[in-house]
Amino acid sequence: MPTSVHFSSAIVLGAGSWGTALAALLAERGLSVQFWGRDEELMRDIQSHRRNERYLPSLILQEGVEATHRIEKLRPADLVLFVVPSKGIRTVAQQLSAAQVLKGSELLVSCTKGIELETGERMTEVIGDCLPDHGLAALSGPNHAEEIAQKQPAAAVVACADSSHARLVQDCFTLPWFRCYTTDDVIGVEWAGALKNVYAISAGIARGMKLGDNAIAALVTRALAEMARFGTSMGGRAETFSGLSGVGDLVTTCYSEHSRNNRVGKLLGQGMPLAEIVSSTRMIAEGVPNTESLYRCARKAGVRTPLLDEVYAILYEDKPAKLAMRDLLSRDPRPEAD
Protein backbone atom coordinates (compact mmCIF):
# COMPACT_ATOMS: atom_id res chain seq x y z
CA MET A 1 0.00 0.00 0.00
CA PRO A 2 1.37 3.45 -0.85
CA THR A 3 2.76 5.33 2.14
CA SER A 4 1.69 8.78 0.99
CA VAL A 5 -1.33 10.42 -0.61
CA HIS A 6 -0.54 12.92 -3.32
CA PHE A 7 -3.96 14.54 -3.08
CA SER A 8 -4.82 16.02 0.31
CA SER A 9 -8.32 17.42 -0.25
CA ALA A 10 -11.53 16.50 -2.02
CA ILE A 11 -15.04 17.71 -2.74
CA VAL A 12 -17.81 15.12 -2.95
CA LEU A 13 -20.92 16.39 -4.75
CA GLY A 14 -23.99 14.33 -3.94
CA ALA A 15 -25.25 13.12 -0.56
CA GLY A 16 -26.87 9.84 -1.51
CA SER A 17 -25.63 6.48 -0.25
CA TRP A 18 -22.75 6.23 -2.76
CA GLY A 19 -21.60 9.80 -2.20
CA THR A 20 -21.63 9.20 1.54
CA ALA A 21 -19.58 6.01 1.20
CA LEU A 22 -17.04 7.71 -1.06
CA ALA A 23 -16.68 10.66 1.32
CA ALA A 24 -15.93 8.18 4.10
CA LEU A 25 -13.39 6.30 1.97
CA LEU A 26 -11.48 9.47 1.14
CA ALA A 27 -11.50 10.62 4.76
CA GLU A 28 -10.26 7.19 5.84
CA ARG A 29 -7.37 7.63 3.41
CA GLY A 30 -6.47 10.90 5.09
CA LEU A 31 -8.00 13.51 2.77
CA SER A 32 -9.97 16.47 4.07
CA VAL A 33 -13.42 16.17 2.49
CA GLN A 34 -16.05 18.80 1.73
CA PHE A 35 -19.35 16.94 1.35
CA TRP A 36 -22.07 18.81 -0.56
CA GLY A 37 -25.75 18.04 -0.98
CA ARG A 38 -28.60 20.29 -2.05
CA ASP A 39 -30.91 19.40 0.88
CA GLU A 40 -30.19 21.90 3.67
CA GLU A 41 -31.90 19.89 6.41
CA LEU A 42 -30.07 16.68 5.45
CA MET A 43 -26.64 18.31 5.28
CA ARG A 44 -27.09 20.11 8.59
CA ASP A 45 -28.10 16.82 10.18
CA ILE A 46 -25.05 15.05 8.70
CA GLN A 47 -22.75 17.80 9.99
CA SER A 48 -24.28 17.63 13.46
CA HIS A 49 -24.58 13.87 13.89
CA ARG A 50 -21.85 12.52 11.53
CA ARG A 51 -24.37 10.17 9.95
CA ASN A 52 -26.55 10.17 6.82
CA GLU A 53 -29.71 8.81 8.43
CA ARG A 54 -31.69 9.09 5.22
CA TYR A 55 -29.49 7.12 2.83
CA LEU A 56 -26.70 5.28 4.70
CA PRO A 57 -27.46 5.24 8.44
CA SER A 58 -25.01 2.44 9.22
CA LEU A 59 -21.96 4.61 8.46
CA ILE A 60 -20.37 7.05 10.91
CA LEU A 61 -18.52 9.81 9.07
CA GLN A 62 -15.10 10.90 10.24
CA GLU A 63 -14.47 14.38 11.64
CA GLY A 64 -12.51 15.16 8.47
CA VAL A 65 -15.79 15.25 6.50
CA GLU A 66 -17.38 18.70 6.41
CA ALA A 67 -21.00 18.70 5.23
CA THR A 68 -22.65 21.71 3.57
CA HIS A 69 -25.61 22.58 1.36
CA ARG A 70 -24.05 25.80 0.03
CA ILE A 71 -22.09 25.13 -3.14
CA GLU A 72 -20.76 28.69 -3.22
CA LYS A 73 -19.05 28.12 0.14
CA LEU A 74 -16.94 25.22 -1.11
CA ARG A 75 -13.19 25.78 -1.16
CA PRO A 76 -10.76 24.66 -3.88
CA ALA A 77 -9.66 21.03 -3.57
CA ASP A 78 -7.40 18.62 -5.42
CA LEU A 79 -10.14 16.17 -6.34
CA VAL A 80 -13.83 16.70 -7.15
CA LEU A 81 -16.20 13.72 -7.26
CA PHE A 82 -19.59 14.01 -9.01
CA VAL A 83 -21.96 11.55 -7.33
CA VAL A 84 -25.37 12.92 -8.30
CA PRO A 85 -28.01 11.26 -10.50
CA SER A 86 -27.21 11.43 -14.21
CA LYS A 87 -30.07 13.82 -14.95
CA GLY A 88 -28.61 16.31 -12.46
CA ILE A 89 -24.94 16.18 -13.47
CA ARG A 90 -25.09 19.14 -15.87
CA THR A 91 -26.99 21.35 -13.43
CA VAL A 92 -24.54 20.68 -10.60
CA ALA A 93 -21.53 21.22 -12.88
CA GLN A 94 -23.02 24.52 -14.05
CA GLN A 95 -23.65 25.59 -10.45
CA LEU A 96 -20.07 24.75 -9.52
CA SER A 97 -18.80 26.73 -12.50
CA ALA A 98 -20.97 29.74 -11.64
CA ALA A 99 -19.80 29.66 -8.02
CA GLN A 100 -16.20 30.04 -9.25
CA VAL A 101 -14.99 27.60 -6.62
CA LEU A 102 -12.40 25.79 -8.70
CA LYS A 103 -8.87 26.96 -9.54
CA GLY A 104 -8.49 24.99 -12.77
CA SER A 105 -6.03 22.39 -11.51
CA GLU A 106 -8.60 20.07 -9.95
CA LEU A 107 -9.19 16.57 -11.27
CA LEU A 108 -12.91 15.99 -11.88
CA VAL A 109 -14.17 12.43 -11.43
CA SER A 110 -17.58 11.13 -12.46
CA CYS A 111 -18.89 8.46 -10.10
CA THR A 112 -22.28 8.43 -11.83
CA LYS A 113 -23.29 5.73 -14.31
CA GLY A 114 -25.47 7.08 -17.06
CA ILE A 115 -25.93 8.79 -20.42
CA GLU A 116 -27.52 12.22 -20.69
CA LEU A 117 -30.94 11.94 -22.33
CA GLU A 118 -30.92 15.18 -24.30
CA THR A 119 -27.41 14.91 -25.75
CA GLY A 120 -26.41 11.24 -25.57
CA GLU A 121 -23.22 12.34 -23.82
CA ARG A 122 -21.30 10.35 -21.25
CA MET A 123 -21.00 11.87 -17.79
CA THR A 124 -17.39 13.02 -18.20
CA GLU A 125 -18.40 14.72 -21.46
CA VAL A 126 -21.20 16.57 -19.67
CA ILE A 127 -18.85 17.67 -16.89
CA GLY A 128 -16.25 18.75 -19.45
CA ASP A 129 -18.84 20.85 -21.29
CA CYS A 130 -19.46 22.88 -18.14
CA LEU A 131 -15.97 22.86 -16.64
CA PRO A 132 -13.45 22.84 -19.48
CA ASP A 133 -9.68 22.72 -19.01
CA HIS A 134 -9.81 20.23 -16.14
CA GLY A 135 -8.57 16.66 -16.00
CA LEU A 136 -11.49 14.22 -16.28
CA ALA A 137 -11.86 10.66 -15.02
CA ALA A 138 -14.55 8.09 -14.25
CA LEU A 139 -14.73 5.75 -11.25
CA SER A 140 -16.77 2.60 -11.75
CA GLY A 141 -17.11 -1.03 -10.75
CA PRO A 142 -19.13 -3.50 -8.65
CA ASN A 143 -19.61 -1.38 -5.55
CA HIS A 144 -22.65 -1.26 -3.30
CA ALA A 145 -22.48 1.55 -0.76
CA GLU A 146 -23.95 -0.65 1.97
CA GLU A 147 -21.03 -3.07 1.75
CA ILE A 148 -18.43 -0.31 1.45
CA ALA A 149 -19.84 1.19 4.65
CA GLN A 150 -19.15 -2.14 6.40
CA LYS A 151 -15.58 -2.20 5.05
CA GLN A 152 -16.24 -5.40 3.14
CA PRO A 153 -13.59 -6.12 0.46
CA ALA A 154 -14.29 -4.47 -2.90
CA ALA A 155 -12.57 -3.24 -6.04
CA ALA A 156 -13.14 -0.50 -8.60
CA VAL A 157 -11.52 0.91 -11.72
CA VAL A 158 -10.61 4.52 -12.44
CA ALA A 159 -10.56 5.46 -16.12
CA CYS A 160 -8.58 8.46 -17.29
CA ALA A 161 -6.81 9.34 -20.53
CA ASP A 162 -3.88 10.64 -18.47
CA SER A 163 -2.23 7.70 -16.69
CA SER A 164 -0.60 9.93 -14.07
CA HIS A 165 -4.00 11.35 -13.12
CA ALA A 166 -5.42 7.84 -12.98
CA ARG A 167 -2.69 6.80 -10.55
CA LEU A 168 -3.40 9.80 -8.32
CA VAL A 169 -7.06 8.79 -8.02
CA GLN A 170 -6.03 5.16 -7.56
CA ASP A 171 -3.85 6.20 -4.63
CA CYS A 172 -6.75 8.04 -2.99
CA PHE A 173 -8.86 4.88 -3.08
CA THR A 174 -6.21 2.38 -2.01
CA LEU A 175 -7.21 0.97 1.38
CA PRO A 176 -6.83 -2.42 3.09
CA TRP A 177 -10.37 -3.40 2.05
CA PHE A 178 -10.68 -1.41 -1.19
CA ARG A 179 -8.54 -1.98 -4.29
CA CYS A 180 -8.56 0.38 -7.27
CA TYR A 181 -7.28 -0.46 -10.76
CA THR A 182 -6.60 1.92 -13.65
CA THR A 183 -7.40 2.05 -17.37
CA ASP A 184 -7.31 4.67 -20.10
CA ASP A 185 -10.56 3.40 -21.68
CA VAL A 186 -12.89 6.10 -20.38
CA ILE A 187 -15.40 5.46 -23.17
CA GLY A 188 -15.70 1.74 -22.47
CA VAL A 189 -15.94 2.17 -18.71
CA GLU A 190 -18.70 4.78 -18.95
CA TRP A 191 -20.76 2.89 -21.50
CA ALA A 192 -20.43 -0.31 -19.47
CA GLY A 193 -21.60 1.45 -16.32
CA ALA A 194 -24.65 2.93 -18.02
CA LEU A 195 -25.63 -0.25 -19.86
CA LYS A 196 -25.47 -2.60 -16.89
CA ASN A 197 -28.23 -0.58 -15.19
CA VAL A 198 -30.65 -1.61 -17.93
CA TYR A 199 -29.71 -5.28 -17.79
CA ALA A 200 -30.06 -5.30 -14.01
CA ILE A 201 -33.68 -4.28 -14.56
CA SER A 202 -34.13 -7.21 -16.96
CA ALA A 203 -32.72 -9.65 -14.38
CA GLY A 204 -35.05 -8.20 -11.77
CA ILE A 205 -38.01 -8.60 -14.11
CA ALA A 206 -37.12 -12.27 -14.54
CA ARG A 207 -37.02 -12.70 -10.76
CA GLY A 208 -40.33 -10.93 -10.36
CA MET A 209 -41.81 -13.35 -12.89
CA LYS A 210 -40.38 -16.20 -10.77
CA LEU A 211 -38.25 -17.50 -13.62
CA GLY A 212 -35.50 -19.94 -12.74
CA ASP A 213 -31.73 -19.75 -12.51
CA ASN A 214 -31.38 -20.96 -16.10
CA ALA A 215 -33.36 -18.00 -17.44
CA ILE A 216 -31.50 -15.44 -15.36
CA ALA A 217 -28.11 -16.90 -16.31
CA ALA A 218 -29.10 -16.73 -19.98
CA LEU A 219 -30.22 -13.11 -19.59
CA VAL A 220 -27.01 -12.04 -17.86
CA THR A 221 -24.80 -13.82 -20.39
CA ARG A 222 -26.58 -12.35 -23.38
CA ALA A 223 -26.61 -8.96 -21.65
CA LEU A 224 -22.81 -9.05 -21.46
CA ALA A 225 -22.62 -9.82 -25.18
CA GLU A 226 -25.00 -6.94 -25.92
CA MET A 227 -23.02 -4.57 -23.65
CA ALA A 228 -19.79 -5.37 -25.46
CA ARG A 229 -21.38 -5.06 -28.91
CA PHE A 230 -22.94 -1.69 -28.06
CA GLY A 231 -19.96 -0.34 -26.13
CA THR A 232 -17.36 -1.22 -28.75
CA SER A 233 -19.51 0.36 -31.45
CA MET A 234 -19.31 3.59 -29.42
CA GLY A 235 -15.52 3.45 -29.19
CA GLY A 236 -14.87 1.35 -26.09
CA ARG A 237 -12.43 -1.56 -26.05
CA ALA A 238 -13.75 -5.12 -25.92
CA GLU A 239 -11.57 -6.15 -22.97
CA THR A 240 -13.09 -3.42 -20.80
CA PHE A 241 -16.39 -5.28 -20.79
CA SER A 242 -14.66 -8.31 -19.27
CA GLY A 243 -13.38 -6.17 -16.40
CA LEU A 244 -14.72 -4.63 -13.22
CA SER A 245 -16.84 -1.97 -14.95
CA GLY A 246 -18.31 -4.56 -17.31
CA VAL A 247 -18.96 -8.13 -16.20
CA GLY A 248 -18.05 -7.27 -12.59
CA ASP A 249 -20.66 -4.56 -12.24
CA LEU A 250 -23.17 -6.50 -14.33
CA VAL A 251 -23.01 -9.59 -12.12
CA THR A 252 -23.25 -7.55 -8.93
CA THR A 253 -26.27 -5.54 -10.01
CA CYS A 254 -28.09 -8.50 -11.56
CA TYR A 255 -27.77 -10.74 -8.51
CA SER A 256 -27.69 -8.42 -5.49
CA GLU A 257 -30.62 -7.35 -3.37
CA HIS A 258 -28.77 -4.05 -2.82
CA SER A 259 -29.30 -3.15 -6.50
CA ARG A 260 -31.97 -0.50 -6.98
CA ASN A 261 -32.32 -1.40 -10.65
CA ASN A 262 -32.79 -5.06 -9.76
CA ARG A 263 -35.47 -4.14 -7.21
CA VAL A 264 -37.30 -1.97 -9.76
CA GLY A 265 -37.21 -4.83 -12.27
CA LYS A 266 -38.52 -7.30 -9.72
CA LEU A 267 -41.51 -5.09 -8.99
CA LEU A 268 -42.15 -4.68 -12.72
CA GLY A 269 -42.03 -8.45 -13.12
CA GLN A 270 -44.60 -8.76 -10.34
CA GLY A 271 -46.91 -6.46 -12.28
CA MET A 272 -46.48 -3.14 -10.45
CA PRO A 273 -46.76 -0.10 -12.78
CA LEU A 274 -43.61 1.97 -13.23
CA ALA A 275 -45.27 5.17 -12.00
CA GLU A 276 -46.19 3.49 -8.73
CA ILE A 277 -42.66 2.10 -8.33
CA VAL A 278 -41.07 5.50 -8.93
CA SER A 279 -43.39 7.30 -6.52
CA SER A 280 -42.83 4.76 -3.73
CA THR A 281 -39.03 4.41 -4.07
CA ARG A 282 -36.84 6.95 -2.28
CA MET A 283 -33.61 5.98 -4.03
CA ILE A 284 -32.91 6.68 -7.68
CA ALA A 285 -32.71 3.68 -10.03
CA GLU A 286 -30.52 5.03 -12.83
CA GLY A 287 -31.60 2.24 -15.17
CA VAL A 288 -35.03 3.80 -15.72
CA PRO A 289 -33.91 7.08 -17.37
CA ASN A 290 -30.82 5.35 -18.78
CA THR A 291 -33.00 2.93 -20.71
CA GLU A 292 -34.53 5.79 -22.69
CA SER A 293 -31.14 7.47 -23.27
CA LEU A 294 -29.49 4.23 -24.39
CA TYR A 295 -32.43 3.22 -26.57
CA ARG A 296 -32.14 6.51 -28.47
CA CYS A 297 -28.37 6.07 -28.83
CA ALA A 298 -28.77 2.50 -30.07
CA ARG A 299 -31.30 3.51 -32.72
CA LYS A 300 -29.09 6.38 -33.86
CA ALA A 301 -26.02 4.14 -34.05
CA GLY A 302 -27.86 1.25 -35.69
CA VAL A 303 -26.73 -1.25 -33.04
CA ARG A 304 -28.74 -4.43 -32.49
CA THR A 305 -29.91 -4.46 -28.84
CA PRO A 306 -32.80 -6.91 -28.34
CA LEU A 307 -32.62 -6.97 -24.53
CA LEU A 308 -32.46 -3.18 -24.28
CA ASP A 309 -35.37 -2.92 -26.72
CA GLU A 310 -37.60 -5.15 -24.60
CA VAL A 311 -36.76 -3.36 -21.35
CA TYR A 312 -37.58 -0.07 -23.08
CA ALA A 313 -40.90 -1.48 -24.27
CA ILE A 314 -41.80 -2.63 -20.75
CA LEU A 315 -40.85 0.71 -19.17
CA TYR A 316 -42.11 3.17 -21.76
CA GLU A 317 -44.67 1.32 -23.90
CA ASP A 318 -46.42 -0.67 -21.15
CA LYS A 319 -45.53 -3.96 -22.79
CA PRO A 320 -46.33 -6.92 -20.51
CA ALA A 321 -43.20 -8.64 -19.22
CA LYS A 322 -44.47 -12.06 -20.29
CA LEU A 323 -44.92 -10.84 -23.85
CA ALA A 324 -41.44 -9.31 -23.85
CA MET A 325 -39.94 -12.61 -22.70
CA ARG A 326 -41.85 -14.50 -25.38
CA ASP A 327 -40.63 -12.12 -28.07
CA LEU A 328 -37.02 -12.49 -26.92
CA LEU A 329 -37.20 -16.26 -27.13
CA SER A 330 -39.01 -16.33 -30.49
CA ARG A 331 -36.40 -14.32 -32.41
CA ASP A 332 -34.65 -15.97 -35.36
CA PRO A 333 -31.84 -18.35 -34.28
CA ARG A 334 -28.31 -16.90 -34.47
CA PRO A 335 -24.71 -17.99 -33.79
CA GLU A 336 -23.74 -17.28 -30.17
CA ALA A 337 -20.88 -15.00 -31.21
CA ASP A 338 -23.16 -12.84 -33.36
Where do the model's predicted regions map?
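Rossmann-like NAD(P)(H) cofactor-binding subdomain of soluble oxidoreductases
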Residues: 61, 67-153, 169
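Internal alpha-helical scaffold of NAD(P)-dependent oxidoreductase catalytic cores
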Residues: 100, 126-134, 153-201, 205-240
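NAD(P)+-binding Rossmann beta1-loop-alpha1 motif at the extreme N-terminus of oxidoreductases
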Residues: 1-59, 68-69
